[in-house]
Design a protein with these regions (language model features):
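Short, ligand-facing micro-motifs at secondary-structure edges
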Residues: 42-61, 83-106, 118, 122, ...
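Non-catalytic DNA-recognition/assembly elements of restriction-modification systems
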Residues: 2-36, 164, 168, 172-177, ...
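Sequence-specific dsDNA recognition surfaces
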Residues: 7-8, 25-36, 40-41, 46-77
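Ligand-binding loop in jelly-roll beta-barrel domains
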Residues: 111-117
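A short glycine-rich beta-alpha junction/loop motif
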Residues: 4-10, 85, 99-106, 140-173
Length: 195
């Protein structure tokens, strides 16, 4: 049996004793790179269902992009992209694209290049983590859907508050094993859904 210890964090509970608890700001750095001068006109979108995609592949409605993309921020492949106003509803994804996004989006990447960004992305996508964010933002409406997902409308969480949160940090080799396992499981589920 693996030794665990109490995190003192209600959403997390116990975690493996050889892991660390760290503030997000010490694990991930925010990329704040403006698209000015314009380096790309490829606008990316982020949805809870589809993740980070080119805007023209987006299903359903949503905000229309601005024609002037010089105020947008740049996102790179390997960046965790999150909508600061919809984190609670699962608007978090790992970008496979270089493009520009609305300035309300955060782009995060590990401080250490050896760490597995997928591990952090999966952590942020857990319902338990997303529910722990209540009270951090300023919002208008919060609803729970029939499948247990939380839906919010404009619940903005400032990066300075987000960065102060503690998350469990596995050793690097274990981060990779966890992310590989979840990638394989998600691919299997996606294949079953597509059939």
């Amino acid at each position: 049996m693996r030794a665990t210890k109490d995190s003192g964090i209600s959403w997390l509970g116990e975690y493996p004793s050889d892991w660390e608890l760290k503030k997000i700001k010490y694990c991930l750095q925010e990329r704040v790179e403006k698209n000015n001068p314009v380096r790309t006109t490829e606008i990316l979108s982020l949805t809870a269902k589809q993740g980070v995609i080119p805007y023209d592949q987006k299903e359903g409605g949503g905000n229309k992009p601005k024609e002037d993309v010089s105020a947008y921020r740049l996102a790179y492949p390997g960046d965790i992209v999150m909508n600061s106003m919809n984190i609670l509803s699962g608007s978090v994804g790992l970008s496979q694209y270089f493009g520009c996004v609305s300035p309300v989006y955060y782009m995060l990447r590990p401080w250490k290049v050896t760490e597995d960004v997928r591990y952090y992305n999966y952590t942020f996508q857990t319902t338990m983590f997303q529910r722990s964010l209540f009270g951090l933002g300023n919002g208008i409406l919060i609803k729970e859907s029939g499948n247990g997902k939380l839906n919010t409308i404009r619940m903005r969480i400032p990066m300075d508050k987000f960065g102060e949160l503690f998350i469990p940090v596995a050793p690097i080799d274990e981060q990779q094993r966890i992310a590989d396992f979840l990638d394989a499981k998600c691919a299997k589920i996606d294949a079953l859904v597509a059939d």
